[in-house]
């Protein structure tokens, strides 16, 4: 039975029910592909005719989040079906099997294959997986060892390679080796691929460049450029042929076009080479023309000169380069041989290092799996292994989500385990227009190959189904997406022709609304050019850079949407939860950028200056945070105190507390020795420096002694403590953790410190040990540009504008998208490296001659450079498509240009063509997103401003009859210079002075009374606390206000200080804190006996986590009983146990205060905070445990007392992890009792 609550389209039904074939579902953005995938899985397991158990289906995704979401959705659907048919044994069975189902990431599946078949390959079953950081460190170590060995061997091939490509310190060659190694891992058999690409350079005597794969690519590329030149000449010819006075230009231009046409129609390399050599250009006839047509004459001459320059460039840089190819290859071959051998040697060195540590990396997971699933036949061809055939027999159907992101290794794996011919069982779903992970070795060609070859007819064994009905975005956005991409996405740029069949169809349901909602797509273009008439004494701060200018534009646009002026209506968005329109909130707006580095900080600053709350999801900036720099400086001087820079940094920090004057006094003692040695001399009253120390007063001497003693103590302690515990000890002992919490942005700063602590905890598990190695580990992270980004502290419901990269937005949707930085140049730096790599075309090296100190690109590098540029631009095209399709209700595009007139002229020139598609040549030579969007909009009736600003008049063929609507705005940089505060003040004063009060003041009497008697509409809201702890909620739900059922902010009761208490022993609350601390730090692998636990408690005393008196309050027997209890045994069995986990969660105020009017307080939020004592994973679900140490009476009263607290813990945990909390327990230490509060 099909889900009766969902209205599936006919194509969706086909995707759900088509049986017994390899099925490719090309699902456009927002077309419900996940829903279709889930429904197909459901139909497989609930269909009586098939009777397939859910564990017999393999469903692979590319992220853990996607796998968890899919499993959850399948589980929810099965549960709902079971509610309707509660006696169904099959549904009960499928729900029971769900936890054993194979809905997982591709890496998880590969790992499962390895663990079940490790005996088939040379792998210890106790292996572990190293993380990216440890992998990078190991690679670096392996590479340095390898280079040292090669230098010691004095290997001539290696020495020549290092001379040619190594740079000053071999770093460039090391980068090439690492890059080529990583690139080769994208091949199913990396070593074979390296050997194959090396053969390309070992030319035979019968070598003919025209027969090579490189010549074919180059011919195609040259043809595209020739068509671009022809198009330019045709356009200018069309412009001048009806202009009187330029008749003498017509014949030369026609002749040039004929010559280019002849080159375009040539099909062989030798012929095109000969024609280019013969190519010549006639001189244009000279004739005096009327001044009125001079601009057209100049334009014609300039265009022809530009085309001539391009054709000569093709001849000199490409065509004639092939003459030296044979000689070049003879010299390059030994170098490439040395390089490929060096990479294979690195492979062995790195592999051995991993084997020594009994670990594998993420690339190994796929390659070991492939090794298990493949074997060779007598001819050496790859066939499925015995293990692969077992999986092929076991899995009834294989589902691949996001198929467009598959790589070649994954493709072979899936081919090995999927059935063939009449039993074909492969279901692939994705959208090649959203393939944006080529930099991770994704191969969109795999999708395209099937997309172009599979049949749409029913009954085909290789069938294709297209889903094009978009259920996400308003029609205005869908129309704009189709309008732009029909013009710009083609086989050359985008790798797919975006035609009518690829167009999205608007199917989203948005109720009609008369207010301010939806609307035209907006394009905002800012001219970066400075105003030539600006004043010489203009404030330098007002000379804004381009990023800040654009950020101010965006800030003004956001304020216009969220905080409209009195004469404007508030912008409304449709909220599915309330099934109605509501006013837009900051959280409805997302600013997307191609890359956030350098851009996000400027946007955050400008938006904050405009009073807009904003959060930037960046992957940089962590190591530059002052709190992280301070702690790292402290660790550096604990390891080696003779380093002056970190030492001074620490002395000046709040941990040291030394002033600049103090540092000057210390340096004067002796300028030749380190600061550490100076402090040591002061502490020990050194006789050698007796006279130099006379100016050190008692205050500074005391300060020095205190700091020096602490430093010595830390240096002793770090030897005996794990690095993570030592870092936390530093935080608490110095009070630095609390200090940064009181600074501006304190929550973020504390989160950053916790992140460093967690990083240290992870480091503890890797093969490198000790403080020195940890510092080295951090330094390598910084030097390798592996900045981690600030710790994430915001939940998804925080009311802030978000800034994120387009890549991070993939798979998400937002009411309002502002695509910023559309004028930022494409990053093409990778295609300029000294050696280029390509899967099909192999290696593209520079020709280098160390003796003559010359280098230049070989013809092969030229080919690879052009091919990689095309692939990069195609990726950028798909990234733009992803950005556009994130928007649900409003799309705004912003960008800056260097010179508005020149830019608009370039756009109009690119748009000056007869076809609907923009010329490939123009698309290839575009510099940024605006260069694609601008020409398309210039041909739209709404793009009139672009055509008007353009200094040269083009008679563009407008695309009429298109449903899309655009608003184009053009600004000068001067529009965004902020008004100085004093000018604002003067304006206000002037307005006040201009007021003329009527002598009859009685007319103001009523207004005065009205204002004095005014009452605040939201008075109750002002009494509601903005933040609660979960413990406060527990008390709050026990109290009832007799008047209105609402309890507002409570009075504050201060605890009696210790010196006023009669008893100096620990209070019950303090004993509880100590027990929680022990339970947080105890090693659960060492809790089998009294002695083991007692030893751990003693260690906490030694490390100063607790005092002797606090340790005596701990009942070791109570802890033993806990770990011998049912819940304790389950916890010990779990691989993932988390303790003392802080959280923040936003809830609606009306949830706590039931009597508040819903229509007024619906958007009022309250922040809930708390710390979860413990939770652990069990069968991919969570078990929550909360300890209680206080004495309890009746169990039922305890249950009632803590029910609310545990409810919010569970709710927060599910939100925090995205996983289901299966059970919630209270453990009562006073009764050794487990209380189930699920």
Swiss-Prot record:
Its cofactor is Mg(2+). InterPro entries: AddA, DNA_helicase_UvrD-like_C, DNA_helicase_UvrD/REP, P-loop_NTPase, PDDEXK-like_dom_sf, PDDEXK_AddAB-type, Restrct_endonuc-II-like, UvrD-like_ATP-bd. It holds the Pfam family UvrD_C. Its EC number is 3.1.-.-, 5.6.2.4. It comes from the Bacteria. Residues 6-474 form the UvrD-like helicase ATP-binding domain. One of its GO terms (cellular component) is cytosol. Heterodimer of AddA and AddB/RexB. The heterodimer acts as both an ATP-dependent DNA helicase and an ATP-dependent, dual-direction single-stranded exonuclease. Recognizes the chi site generating a DNA molecule suitable for the initiation of homologous recombination. The AddA nuclease domain is required for chi fragment generation; this subunit has the helicase and 3' -> 5' nuclease activities. This is ATP-dependent helicase/nuclease subunit A. The gene is addA.
């Amino acid at each position: 039975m099909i889900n009766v609550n969902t209205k599936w389209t006919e194509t969706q039904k086909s995707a759900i029910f088509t049986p017994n074939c390899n099925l490719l579902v090309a699902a456009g953005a927002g077309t419900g592909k996940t829903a279709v995938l889930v429904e197909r899985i459901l139909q497989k397991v609930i269909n009586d005719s098939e009777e397939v158990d859910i564990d017999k289906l393999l469903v692979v995704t590319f992220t853990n989040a996607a796998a968890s979401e899919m499993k959850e959705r399948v589980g929810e659907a099965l549960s709902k079906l079971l509610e309707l048919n509660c006696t169904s044994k099959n549904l009960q069975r499928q729900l029971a099997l769900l936890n054993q189902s194979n809905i997982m990431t591709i890496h998880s599946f590969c790992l499962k294959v390895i663990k079940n078949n490790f005996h088939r390959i040379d792998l210890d079953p106790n292996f572990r997986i190293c993380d990216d950081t440890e992998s990078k460190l190991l690679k670096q170590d392996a590479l340095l060892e390898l280079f040292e060995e090669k230098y010691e061997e004095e290997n001539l091939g290696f020495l020549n390679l290092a001379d040619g490509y190594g740079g000053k310190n071999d770093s460039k060659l090391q980068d090439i080796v690492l890059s080529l190694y990583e690139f080769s891992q994208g091949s199913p058999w990396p070593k074979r691929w390296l050997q194959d690409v090396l053969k390309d350079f070992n030319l035979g005597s019968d070598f003919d460049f025209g027969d090579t794969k490189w010549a074919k690519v180059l011919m195609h590329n040259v043809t595209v450029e020739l068509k671009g030149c022809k198009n330019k000449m045709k356009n200018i010819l069309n412009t001048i042929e009806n202009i009187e006075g330029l008749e003498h230009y017509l014949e030369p231009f026609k002749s040039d076009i004929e010559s280019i046409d002849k080159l375009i129609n040539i099909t062989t390399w030798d012929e095109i080479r000969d024609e280019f050599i013969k190519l010549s250009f006639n001189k244009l006839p000279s004739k005096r023309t009327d001044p009125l047509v001079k601009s057209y004459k100049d334009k014609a001459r300039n265009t022809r000169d530009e085309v001539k320059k391009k054709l000569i460039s093709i001849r000199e840089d490409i065509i004639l380069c092939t003459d030296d190819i044979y000689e070049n290859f003879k010299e390059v071959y030994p170098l490439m041989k040395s390089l490929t051998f060096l990479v294979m040697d690195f492979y062995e060195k790195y592999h051995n290092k991993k084997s020594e540590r009994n670990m594998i990396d993420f690339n190994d997971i796929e390659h070991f799996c492939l090794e298990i699933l493949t074997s060779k036949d007598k001819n050496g061809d790859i066939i499925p292994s015995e293990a692969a055939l077992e999986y092929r027999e076991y899995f009834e159907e294989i589902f691949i989500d996001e198929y467009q992101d598959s790589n070649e290794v994954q493709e072979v794996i899936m081919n090995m385990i999927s059935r063939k011919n009449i039993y074909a069982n492969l279901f692939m779903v994705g959208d090649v227009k959203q393939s944006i992970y080529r930099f991770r070795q994704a191969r969109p060609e795999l999708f395209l190959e099937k997309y172009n070859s599979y049949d749409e007819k029913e009954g085909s064994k290789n069938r294709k189904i297209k889903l094009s009905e978009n259920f996400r975005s308003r029609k205005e956005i869908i129309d704009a997406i189709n309008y732009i991409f029909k013009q710009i996405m083609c086989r050359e740029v985008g790798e797919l022709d975006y035609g009518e069949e690829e167009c999205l169809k608007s199917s989203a349901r948005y109720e009609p609304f008369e207010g301010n909602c939806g609307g035209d797509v907006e394009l905002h273009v800012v001219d970066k050019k400075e105003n030539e008439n600006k004043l010489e004494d203009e404030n330098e701060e007002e000379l804004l850079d381009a990023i800040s200018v654009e950020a101010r534009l965006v800030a003004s646009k956001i304020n216009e949407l969220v905080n409209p002026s009195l004469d404007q209506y508030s912008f409304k968005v449709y909220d599915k939860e309330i099934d109605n329109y509501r006013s837009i909130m900051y959280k409805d707006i997302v600013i997307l950028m191609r890359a956030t580095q350098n851009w996000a900080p400027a946007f955050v600053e400008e938006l904050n200056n405009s009073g807009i709350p904003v959060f930037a999801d960046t992957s940089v900036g962590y190591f530059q945070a002052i709190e992280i720099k301070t702690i790292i400086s402290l660790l550096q001087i604990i390891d080696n105190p003779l380093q002056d820079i970190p030492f001074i940094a620490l002395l000046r920090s709040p941990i040291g507390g030394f002033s600049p004057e103090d540092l000057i006094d210390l340096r004067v003692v002796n300028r030749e020795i380190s600061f550490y040695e100076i402090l040591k001399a002061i502490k020990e009253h050194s006789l050698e420096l007796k006279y130099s120390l006379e100016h050190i007063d008692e205050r500074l001497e005391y300060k020095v002694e205190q700091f020096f003693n602490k430093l010595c103590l830390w240096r002793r302690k770090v030897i005996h403590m794990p690095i993570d515990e030592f870092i936390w000890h530093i935080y608490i002992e110095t009070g630095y953790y609390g200090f940064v919490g009181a600074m501006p942005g304190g929550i973020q700063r504390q989160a950053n410190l916790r992140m460093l602590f967690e990083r240290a905890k992870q480091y503890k598990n890797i093969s490198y040990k000790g403080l020195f190695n940890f510092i080295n580990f951090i330094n390598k992270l910084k030097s390798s540009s592996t900045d981690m980004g600030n710790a994430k502290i915001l939940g998804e419901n925080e009311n802030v504008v978000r800034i994120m990269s387009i890549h991070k937005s993939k798979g998400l949707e937002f009411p309002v998208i502002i695509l910023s930085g559309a004028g930022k140049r494409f990053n093409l730096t990778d295609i300029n490296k000294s050696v280029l790599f390509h899967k099909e075309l192999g290696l593209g090296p520079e020709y280098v001659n160390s003796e003559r100190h010359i280098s230049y690109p070989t013809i092969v590098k030229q080919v690879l450079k052009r091919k990689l540029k095309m692939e990069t631009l195609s990726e950028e095209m798909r990234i733009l498509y992803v950005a556009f399709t994130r928007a649900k209700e409003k799309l705004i595009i912003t960008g800056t240009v260097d010179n508005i007139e020149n830019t608009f002229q370039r756009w109009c020139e690119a748009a000056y063509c007869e076809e609907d598609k923009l010329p490939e040549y123009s698309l290839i030579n575009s510099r940024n997103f605006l260069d694609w969007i601008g020409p398309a909009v210039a041909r739209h009736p709404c793009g009139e401003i672009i055509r008007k600003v353009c200094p040269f008049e083009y008679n563009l063929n407008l695309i009429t009859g298109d449903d899309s609507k655009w608003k184009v705005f053009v600004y000068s940089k001067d529009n965004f210079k902020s008004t100085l505060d004093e000018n604002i003040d003067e304006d206000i004063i002037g307005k006040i002075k201009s007021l003329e009060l009527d002598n009859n003041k009685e007319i103001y009497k009523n207004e005065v009374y009205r204002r004095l008697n005014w009452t605040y509409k939201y008075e109750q809201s002002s009494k509601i606390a903005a933040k609660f702890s979960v413990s406060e909620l527990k008390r709050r739900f026990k109290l009832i206000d007799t008047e209105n059922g609402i309890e507002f902010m409570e009075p504050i009761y201060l605890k009696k200080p210790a010196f006023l208490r009669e008893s100096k022993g620990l209070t019950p609350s303090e004993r509880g804190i100590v027990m929680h601390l022990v339970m947080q730090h105890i090693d659960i692998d060492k809790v089998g006996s009294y002695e083991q636990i007692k030893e751990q408690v003693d260690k906490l005393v030694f490390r100063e986590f607790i005092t002797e008196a606090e340790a005596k309050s701990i009942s070791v027997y109570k802890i033993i009983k806990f770990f011998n209890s049912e819940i304790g045994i389950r916890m010990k069995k779990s691989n993932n146990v988390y303790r003392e986990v802080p959280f923040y969660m936003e809830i609606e105020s009306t949830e706590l205060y039931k009597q508040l009017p819903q229509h007024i307080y619906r958007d009022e939020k309250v922040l809930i905070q708390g710390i979860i004592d413990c939770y652990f994973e069990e069968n991919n679900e969570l078990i929550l445990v909360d300890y209680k140490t206080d004495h309890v009476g009746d169990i039922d009263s305890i249950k009632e007392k803590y029910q609310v607290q545990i409810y919010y813990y569970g709710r927060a945990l599910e939100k925090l992890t995205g996983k289901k909390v299966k059970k919630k327990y209270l453990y009562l230490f006073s009764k050794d009792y487990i209380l189930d509060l699920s």
